[in-house]
C-alpha cells in the first residue's frame, strides 16, 4: 500500500502499525525525508536497502525521540561525543554510538577492528518527535537519505 497522509492521530497510529508490522513509512525530519522501519526487524532493514538500492556497506542511522533512549537500546556515546550530544541534540548532529553486547538493533555495523557501532539522530522537529513517539515499543528508524 502506498499513500500520502496528513499528520494527525489517525495517521500516526497507522504509521506505528505499519512499522510494528515490519513495513516501511516515509517521514519528514528536520533535514530530509527518511525511510522508517523497526530497527530490530532484519527483514524491514533488508527492504530499506532494496527499495533505496543502497549498498549494504553503507550504514543506516537510528532515529531517536530523546538522547536518553540510548541506554535502553544498548548504546553508549563515548566522550567527548556524549558532551557534544548534550549540547547539540536535538538537531542536525549524528554521533556514532558504541553498541554494547545487549544491543539488539539489526542496523549495527562493525568497524575493521571489530568495534560495533551505530549512527544516531535526534531530529529537532516537533512533527518527527510526534511520529517517533507514536511507535512506543521502539522509535522509528531512518536512513537520512532521500527515497
Q: Where are the language model's segments positioned?
A:
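Active-site-adjacent structural elements in enzyme catalytic cores
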Residues: 1-145
Amino acid at each position: 500500500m502506498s499513500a500520502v497522509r496528513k499528520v494527525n492521530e489517525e495517521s500516526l497510529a497507522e504509521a506505528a502499525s505499519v512499522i510494528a508490522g515490519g513495513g516501511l513509512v516515509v517521514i519528514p525530519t528536520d533535514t530530509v525525508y527518511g525511510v522508517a522501519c523497526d530497527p530490530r526487524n532484519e527483514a524491514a532493514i533488508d527492504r530499506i536497502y532494496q527499495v533505496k538500492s543502497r549498498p549494504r556497506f553503507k550504514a543506516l542511522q537510528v532515529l531517536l525521540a530523546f538522547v536518553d533512549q540510548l541506554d535502553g537500546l544498548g548504546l553508549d556515546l563515548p566522550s567527548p561525543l556524549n558532551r557534544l550530544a548534550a549540547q547539540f541534540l536535538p538537531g542536525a548532529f549524528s554521533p556514532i554510538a558504541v553498541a554494547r553486547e545487549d544491543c539488539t538493533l539489526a542496523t549495527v555495523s562493525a568497524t575493521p577492528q571489530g568495534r560495533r557501532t551505530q549512527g544516531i539522530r535526534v531530529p529537532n522537529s516537533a512533527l518527527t518527535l510526534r511520529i517517533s513517539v507514536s511507535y512506543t515499543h521502539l522509535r522509528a528508524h531512518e536512513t537520512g537519505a532521500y527515497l
